[in-house]
């Protein structure tokens, strides 16, 4: 929005031309999202306490979690607000990719909001019926994917980039829709499953979003895309603004979500952030890189799949409890140790993912 204002004001003062640079707007977006989160955080927490929107805890979970019962949840609304406002302020709203990102973010956020609200009103951990939850997640994902397919079905925007192989980039055709569906829905659920400890999901989210900001910038720059042997995608550079908004909002939320948490993001935050990371990976054609950089999310999701599958087939559990972060808690690891070690692993995976861009 401010891009258009700057284009007008530059006639009178050339300094406003700086706002046209994506790097300047990326930094300003991050700071805006961060400050909004820090500013509204105490107000949101107080309002959630007044409304008695408290966290419900699983009866079969670690005993240390019983103390968390009643902690304000649905704090993800301030993440969404921070991302939305900062993106609308600093992004070029003529770019269709921005609207696709916001559509998935708020679409999944709405699904998570309903899920959280049902848990709170029913005073248990059961939210939306699973089939309806996946139905609406699928609807949002497919609308976004078909929108993107229509925008770039005959360009590099639908090629599959494979790490380490610079000359292998097959055109996906209609399979683009199938792959993109599983990326968005899968990432949404994976981040949701990871969000079980104070700050566990939000820091990896910020790290992955920050890495995708760099990748989006390179993908939208003809020279860097050619240098790195990745597809040049016309609209992708503006996705940098959206990614840095996620980073800023996530860091702001972490201020209140760090152990011991004053607020939890709830499904309204975790589903939205997961869906957002998924759609960004699709936009910059780095689905495989998302698997590497978001390895913590992948392992958390796989631990649940393996646990459920093993119990149904063999009546035996692989882990003491799933997702896997609870397994380590039940082994005696203090919660802060689990969180920090998962953060370290996430940082290493993000750096490994970025390195693969050059090792091609």
From Swiss-Prot:
Source species, domain of life: Bacteria
Coiled-coil parts of chain: none
NCBIfam families noted in UniProt: mraY
Recorded topology in the membrane: Multi-pass membrane protein
Transmembrane segments: 21-41, 73-93, 94-114, 132-152, 168-188, 199-219, 239-259, 263-283, 288-308, 338-358
Listed name of the protein: Phospho-N-acetylmuramoyl-pentapeptide-transferase
Keywords per UniProt: Cell cycle, Cell division, Cell inner membrane, Cell membrane, Cell shape, Cell wall biogenesis/degradation, Magnesium, Membrane, Metal-binding, Peptidoglycan synthesis, Transferase, Transmembrane, Transmembrane helix
Co-factor(s): Mg(2+)
Principal subcellular localisation of the protein: membrane
Gene name linked to the record: mraY
Record's GO cellular component terms: plasma membrane
Pathway assignment: Cell wall biogenesis; peptidoglycan biosynthesis
One of the GO BP terms on file: regulation of cell shape
Claim: Iron is one of the keywords in the record: no
Any one GO molecular function term: phospho-N-acetylmuramoyl-pentapeptide-transferase activity
Enzyme Commission number(s): 2.7.8.13
Gene source species: Haemophilus influenzae (strain PittEE)
Main function: Catalyzes the initial step of the lipid cycle reactions in the biosynthesis of the cell wall peptidoglycan: transfers peptidoglycan precursor phospho-MurNAc-pentapeptide from UDP-MurNAc-pentapeptide onto the lipid carrier undecaprenyl phosphate, yielding undecaprenyl-pyrophosphoryl-MurNAc-pentapeptide, known as lipid I.
Entry-linked PROSITE patterns: MRAY_1, MRAY_2
Family recorded in the similarity comment: Belongs to the glycosyltransferase 4 family. MraY subfamily.
Reaction(s) the record says it catalyses: UDP-N-acetyl-alpha-D-muramoyl-L-alanyl-gamma-D-glutamyl-meso-2,6-diaminopimeloyl-D-alanyl-D-alanine + di-trans,octa-cis-undecaprenyl phosphate = di-trans,octa-cis-undecaprenyl diphospho-N-acetyl-alpha-D-muramoyl-L-alanyl-D-glutamyl-meso-2,6-diaminopimeloyl-D-alanyl-D-alanine + UMP
Subcellular location: Cell inner membrane
